[in-house]
A protein has these predicted regions:
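Short loop/turn motifs that recur once per blade in beta-propeller domains
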Residues: 43-57, 61-64, 68, 120-132, ...
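Short, conserved, GDST-rich strand-edge loop motifs in beta-rich repeat architectures
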Residues: 93-103, 207-235, 398-414
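N-terminal secretory signal peptides
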Residues: 1-9, 19-22, 33-34
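Beta-propeller blade termini
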Residues: 73-83, 134-144, 184-194, 198, ...
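Gly/Ser/Thr/Pro-enriched helix-cap/hinge segments flanking short amphipathic alpha-helices
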Residues: 40, 50-51, 61-62, 369-372, ...
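C-terminal segment of N-terminal export signals and the immediately downstream linker at the start
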Residues: 7, 27-54
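N-terminal export leaders
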Residues: 9-18, 119, 169, 252, ...
């Protein structure tokens, strides 16, 4: 993640493109360049703090010592903590730890949605201010009471906040047994054993504390004389992540060793729960920094098999480990199989993996245009989503170099970097960032990225958390130009959040499918609702939901309203 760019092996673009002839299903993914295929300009509008009321700012505690955690946080989340149907916002901050003593009190922030485009800080009343050097957040209803709970990852000790259902939370970390000591990063709620309860996977980064801090620099470079740089994570030892099984009584059991997680120590950042082989058991794709990425395939709830190497997602070209940070999963080419994406450091290119239906993947970053667009970028949070509701899956990425001294060395790599927006015309991805308005020209220290429709207009909005800076709230304008139906799924036999559900929908000549994944991005958590875009078509013919195991229910819903959210409950035949 923190190495200085140099001469790296690069995929020969023309050779890669020619290789698509062997895979006809790649042809329609090739970089689209027709300006007529591009969506309207200015798809997102920045909502300034003066308008939103979100005045909180992230403080990294940056020091001349260059302690590694300073450059990596933090995350953000959309969640409806009070169950009023409107997405609230949670932001994670740094705090006191063995290497950082803040000059003033620092805290995380929970902002309640006022339903008018503004937010009110309710952190103190809710009791979710944190208490350490925060990293990320994951929202999920682990006890099935209908209110989202909140897991906050930290350097040192993480926190589980149980939602009391009255606007307040209780720290139940010790009782639940999920403190996950060490340096935790991303986390995800998902039901790995299909017992109907959400379990918890927590990524762990390197073996680090103040006593293990190294002074790293480049004494041979005059521009860095006497200065420390953030160390390359390669010098730190990898650590195994955690898997906690939900016992159904408010407690969890650490099953990391039993399930094969501890067999694979890593330097893990992002995680997404998905189903890469369509067997109905949720798998995990984990981004690792300077060691191979993990693809933990769930062998029917009995054990996870790590197949990153054999699947083709563990390494970059030439068999080299890259600096994986953010991840996501979606059925990009609509063949019924979930694809994968990972962001990396500059000069490594981001990884875009198309599922070959046999537990192997092809990296199509070259022919899709991703490699060319990301050569000089360092990516963190990202999400696949249909931002303009035309029925095609687009891609948004937050970027920013982790080393704030990089500009003293290189002319073409910057510390702060702009967002990247790729529009899917149905024929491929087009990088439309430069023509998408001022916000996409702004350099920022992007880290977390969360999706959520905060104004309930069906156009999914975006929250970006920036390192040592204010967050960025983006209102989606483009999505309002097309028709949509939003789904709120409630499981009964399956997990209440319905993580793992498969949704298929038909509108005239348009047929699409998606999956409700768990997690994704970097240190962040998202609106649990799903928005189905259908473009200019005026009617949704039907929506089919295949509920996750242990449910065996498959339901088809018709006579659907347009341009509004509806509630679908497992086993109940009518939408609400």
């Amino acid at each position: 993640m923190f190495f200085r760019p140099g001469l790296c092996g690069r995929r020969n673009f023309l050779q890669t493109l020619a290789g698509t002839l062997a895979f006809p299903w790649l042809n329609r993914l090739v970089w689209a360049a027709d300006p007529q295929d591009r969506p309207p300009t200015y798809p997102f509008l920045e909502i300034p703090a003066a308008a939103s009321g979100i005045t909180w700012t992230h403080t990294a505690g940056s020091s001349a010592e260059k302690y590694l955690p300073e450059s990596t946080g933090a995350g953000c989340a959309f969640l409806d903590y009070d169950n009023d149907g409107w997405m609230d916002i949670y932001l994670v901050n740094s705090g006191p730890c063995d290497f950082f003593a803040p000059a003033r009190p620092l805290r995380n922030a929970l902002y309640r949605n006022n339903r008018d485009g503004t937010f009110t800080d309710v952190t103190e009343r809710a009791g979710v201010s944190g208490g350490g050097y925060g990293m990320g957040a994951a929202a999920g209803d682990y006890n099935g009471d209908g209110f989202p709970d909140l897991y906050v990852t930290q350097y040192g000790r993480s926190i589980l906040y149980r939602n009391n259902g009255d606007g307040t939370f209780t720290d139940v970390t010790e009782k639940a047994g999920v403190a996950a000591p060490g340096w935790a990063s991303s986390a995800v709620w998902f039901d790995y054993d299909n017992d109907g309860r959400l379990d918890l996977f927590v990524c762990r980064f390197v073996d680090f504390d103040k006593s293990k801090h190294h002074h790293c620099g480049a004494p041979n470079l005059p521009a860095l004389a006497g200065l420390n740089e953030y160390c390359y994570p390669k010098i730190y030892s990898p650590m195994p992540s955690w898997l906690f099984h939900n016992n159904g009584d408010g407690t969890f059991t650490d099953v990391s060793q039993k399930m094969g997680i501890t067999d694979n120590p890593g330097k893990s950042w992002g995680v997404v729960a998905t189903d890469i082989n369509n067997d109905g058991w949720l798998d995990l794709f984990v981004a690792n920094d300077t060691v191979a990425n993990f693809l933990f395939v769930n062998r029917q709830g009995r054990r996870f098999e790590e197949i990153g190497f054999t699947s083709g997602v563990g390494f970059g070209e030439g068999g080299k480990a890259r600096s994986g940070m953010g991840v996501d999963s979606a059925d990009f080419n609509q063949d019924g199989w979930m694809d994968l994406f990972v962001t990396n450091l500059n000069h490594e290119f981001y990884g875009f993996y198309l599922n070959r239906h046999d537990e192997t993947f092809d990296d199509i970053a070259g022919p899709s245009g991703i490699a060319n667009a990301t050569k000089l970028m360092s990516g963190w949070g990202l999400k696949f989503f249909d931002y303009d509701n035309d029925g095609n899956i687009d891609l948004l990425i937050a970027n920013g170099r982790p080393d704030d001294l990089i500009e003293k060395i290189y002319d073409n790599v910057t510390y702060r970097e702009p967002l990247l927006l790729f529009h899917n015309s149905g024929a491929g991805l087009t990088n439309i960032s430069r023509e998408s308005g001022p916000v996409f020209s702004r350099a920022m220290s992007g880290r977390g990225l969360a999706l959520g429709d905060f104004n309930n207009d069906g156009a999914v909005d975006v929250l970006i958390s920036n390192n040592d800076a204010a967050p960025l709230l983006l209102k989606n304008i483009a999505g309002k130009g097309n028709h949509w139906v939003g789904l709120s799924l409630t499981g009964k036999t399956c997990n209440r959040d319905a993580v793992g559900a498969r949704i298929t929908w038909q509108s005239g000549d348009l047929k699409r499918s998606t999956m409700k994944t768990g997690g994704g991005s970097y240190l962040s958590s998202h609106d649990p609702r799903i928005v189905l875009g259908i473009g200019e078509r005026g009617k949704m013919d039907w929506i089919e939901v295949k509920w996750p195991r242990p449910s065996t229910v498959v339901q088809r819903f018709t006579d659907l309203p347009m341009d509004r959210y509806i509630s679908l409950v497992e086993g109940e035949g009518k939408w609400k």
